[in-house]
């Protein structure tokens, strides 16, 4: 499972890959990343891998959620076969959530599983996609519907890389961090409420603390329920709404933006069902807005929206099961939620 030996959170750790990876040995290595990222990191990564005497190739994947596809999956496997990767080879994922999900999935299937190392470069990947062993790709009908559980050998999280992350992607990463506060940590939630000026400045020391706390929360869930059959479902707070928002908008919303809207919908619904208070709902919405994250939906057909929610992999026999908040730091799972209540929530939350 996750422990201090296989994930590192340290500014500038990507400057010294040899120190963290020299105990490992691989026959061949493939780096999967985006073209723009490779321009930024090619010299640094190449120098480090030469020091390790690793024989590597690079596979460039287009940016965007649409790259989590069977087309790109097949490209990866063809590359592996062309470069004669064997069971003692390694896949390095350099990038955000899309790269981690895709690289992890193709590695988990190739020769029934080869090792991965994650070098996440977005905040969302640092606190979510790289942690926990979930991998997955999308189809035209569902998000992350094809996937596996495959823990990386190593995760190197370098908060310094966030200095060059776009404002939009930086803000989107905080949706998952706010989620951790809502499901498990009132202290983290309050810390975010009171520290926003430093967060906006991307203070490295502060970010290390926030990332450490976020990863520690996810680690507890993963260790308690690795295969996502019980309490780990709480990590999906905001995601059942959010995944549909992503799909129906054709991924015009970043994952974190969609999760922010999803959490707002979930809190409103919870309030209508008498499970939480308006104060809890308003605190969450205020923090998301402080992070400049959206909390309102665009106009989507309601019947289509609830139909897609019922197809979510957490559902059963067409029912819609949701994680809903009771208070900051505590959520509960509600099974077979009335679609009419959901439609009312969606209608209320749509942009006027």
Swiss-Prot record:
Per UniProt, Zn(2+) binds at: 176, 239, 255
Q: How is the cofactor bound?
A: Binds 1 divalent metal cation per subunit. Can use either Co(2+) or Zn(2+).
Taxonomy, superkingdom = Bacteria
Q: What class of enzyme is it?
A: lyase
Enumerate the Gene Ontology biological process terms. amino acid biosynthetic process; aromatic amino acid family biosynthetic process; chorismate biosynthetic process
Q: What is its EC number?
A: 4.2.3.4
Q: Name one Pfam family in it.
A: DHQS_C
One term under GO cellular component: cytoplasm
What cofactor does its activity depend on? Co(2+); Zn(2+); NAD(+)
The record's keywords, sorted A to Z, are: Amino-acid biosynthesis, Aromatic amino acid biosynthesis, Cobalt, Cytoplasm, Lyase, Metal-binding, NAD, Nucleotide-binding, Zinc
What the entry lists under Gene3D superfamilies is as follows: 3.40.50.1970, Dehydroquinate synthase-like - alpha domain
Q: Where does the chain bind NAD(+)?
A: 63-68, 97-101, 121-122, 134, 143, 161-164
Q: In which pathway does it act?
A: Metabolic intermediate biosynthesis; chorismate biosynthesis; chorismate from D-erythrose 4-phosphate and phosphoenolpyruvate: step 2/7
Record's catalysed reaction(s):
7-phospho-2-dehydro-3-deoxy-D-arabino-heptonate = 3-dehydroquinate + phosphate
* Location(s) in or outside the cell: Cytoplasm
Entry's Gene Ontology molecular function annotations: 3-dehydroquinate synthase activity; metal ion binding; nucleotide binding
Protein family (similarity comment): Belongs to the sugar phosphate cyclases superfamily. Dehydroquinate synthase family.
Q: What does this protein do?
A: Catalyzes the conversion of 3-deoxy-D-arabino-heptulosonate 7-phosphate (DAHP) to dehydroquinate (DHQ).
HAMAP family documented for this protein: DHQ_synthase
What name does this protein carry? 3-dehydroquinate synthase
What organism does this protein naturally occur in?
Protochlamydia amoebophila (strain UWE25)
């Amino acid at each position: 499972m996750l422990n201090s030996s296989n994930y590192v959170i340290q500014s500038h750790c990507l400057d010294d890959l040899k120190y963290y990876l020299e105990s490992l040995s691989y026959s061949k290595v493939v780096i999967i990343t985006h073209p723009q990222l490779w321009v930024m990191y090619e010299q640094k990564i190449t120098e480090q891998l030469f020091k390790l005497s690793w024989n590597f190739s690079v596979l460039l994947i287009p940016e965007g959620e649409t790259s989590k596809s069977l087309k790109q999956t097949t490209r990866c496997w063809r590359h592996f076969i062309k470069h004669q990767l064997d069971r003692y080879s390694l896949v390095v994922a350099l990038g955000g959530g899309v790269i981690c999900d895709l690289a992890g999935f193709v590695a988990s299937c190739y020769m029934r599983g080869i090792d991965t190392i994650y070098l996440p470069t977005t905040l969302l990947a640092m606190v979510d996609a790289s942690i926990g062993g979930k991998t997955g790709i999308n189809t035209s009908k569902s998000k992350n519907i094809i996937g596996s559980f495959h823990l990386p050998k190593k995760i190197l999280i370098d908060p310094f890389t966030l200095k060059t992350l776009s404002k939009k992607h930086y803000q989107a990463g905080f949706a998952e961090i706010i989620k951790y506060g809502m499901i498990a940590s009132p202290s983290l939630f309050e810390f975010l409420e009171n520290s926003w000026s430093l967060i906006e400045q991307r203070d490295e020391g502060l970010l290390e603390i926030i990332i450490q706390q976020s990863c520690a929360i996810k680690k507890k869930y993963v260790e308690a329920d690795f295969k996502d059959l019980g309490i780990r479902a709480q990590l999906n707070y905001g995601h059942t709404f959010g995944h549909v928002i992503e799909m129906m908008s054709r991924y015009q919303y970043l994952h974190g933006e969609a999760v922010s809207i999803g959490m707002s919908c979930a809190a409103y619904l919870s309030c209508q069902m008498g499970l939480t208070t308006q104060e809890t709902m308003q605190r969450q919405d205020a923090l998301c807005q402080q992070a400049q994250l959206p909390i309102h939906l665009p106009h989507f057909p309601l019947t289509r929206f609830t139909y897609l929610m019922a197809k979510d992999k957490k559902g059963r026999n067409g029912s819609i099961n949701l994680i809903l908040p009771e208070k900051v730091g505590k959520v509960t799972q509600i099974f077979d939620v009335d679609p009419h209540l959901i439609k009312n929530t969606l209608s209320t939350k749509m942009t006027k």
